[in-house]
């Protein structure tokens, strides 16, 4: 509790309430806020505004380039292709084994 008392003194810098919100200091009279029409009649002249520079038009919403990486099924451009292209190999495509041990890519250090 000593730490809380010190924090209260350092931060609030006032007397600590005994207990609960009812013990907090009451405002003796309510604040009297003037209506907007009752405020001071002195007005300041407005400052001239600078001309607005034309901005580039807002472009259409761009597709998220990472969408196809993290959510492959939600890529709008490849959604209709499905597994015909990506999940099944082409009939004439070489396997990894074929590629690694073919004559062109085979290591020259092995027989």
Curated annotation (Swiss-Prot):
InterPro entries: DRM/ARP
Domain of life: Eukaryota
Keywords associated with the record: Auxin signaling pathway
Region (Disordered): 18-111
BP GO annotations: auxin-activated signaling pathway
Ribosomal protein is among the record's keywords: no
Induction of synthesis: Repressed by exogenous auxin.
Biased composition (Polar residues): 74-95
Biased composition (Low complexity): 43-57
Transmembrane helix as UniProt keyword: no
Similarity comment text for this entry: Belongs to the DRM1/ARP family.
Protein's recorded name: Auxin-repressed 12.5 kDa protein
Species of provenance: Fragaria ananassa
């Amino acid at each position: 509790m000593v730490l809380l008392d010190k924090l209260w003194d350092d931060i609030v810098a006032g007397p600590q309430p005994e207990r609960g919100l009812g013990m907090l200091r009451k405002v003796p009279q309510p604040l009297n806020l003037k209506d907007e029409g009752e405020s001071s009649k002195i007005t300041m002249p407005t400052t001239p505004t600078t001309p607005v520079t034309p901005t580039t038009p807002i472009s259409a919403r761009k597709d998220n380039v990472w969408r196809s990486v993290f959510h492959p099924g939600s890529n709008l451009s490849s959604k209709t292709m499905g597994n015909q292209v990506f999940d099944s190999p082409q009939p004439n495509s070489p396997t990894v084994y074929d590629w690694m041990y073919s004559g062109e890519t085979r290591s020259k250090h092995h027989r």
